[in-house]
Amino acid sequence: FPDKQLAFSPEFLRAASALEDLQNTKLMLLGGTGCKTWREVFHVDIEIAEPRELILAKYARNSFLALKVAFFNQMYDLCDALDVEYSAVAHYTTMDERIGDSHSFITEERGFGGHCFPKDINALVKTAQRNNVELSILKETVEYNRRIRKS
């Protein structure tokens, strides 16, 4: 499409609050040839990058959050085995601003589900495999999640 201006923007909306997330966007990530127009339309900070970088960043963000969910589920399992109160351990752990409490809450369903986390972590693992890169931490995250979601 040499005569067209195309822009790519990965969405980081949460399914449960997509409209609110969209209305309260503080930063847009854009890539492609048609990015300048978006600066005139949206009055938010806009970061312009290569589309491939943005695609990989989207997968990385969601994979990291899936990993965080799995980590806290494993901490829950350890607390249960040691007869230690998980909510206290999670609270004291997430007090560290670098960690934060997002994705640390254990639900009855356990692990991560929904549409984006499973799709994106699997896409990142498969992309790495096709390029002869081993993402063993993420592969184990997928396997662990599969095991706890089955039970």
What positions do the PLM features span?
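Internal alpha-helical scaffold of NAD(P)-dependent oxidoreductase catalytic cores
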Residues: 1-9, 13-101, 127-133, 140
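A short glycine/serine-rich beta->alpha loop
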Residues: 108-112
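Ferredoxin-like iron-sulfur electron-transfer modules
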Residues: 143
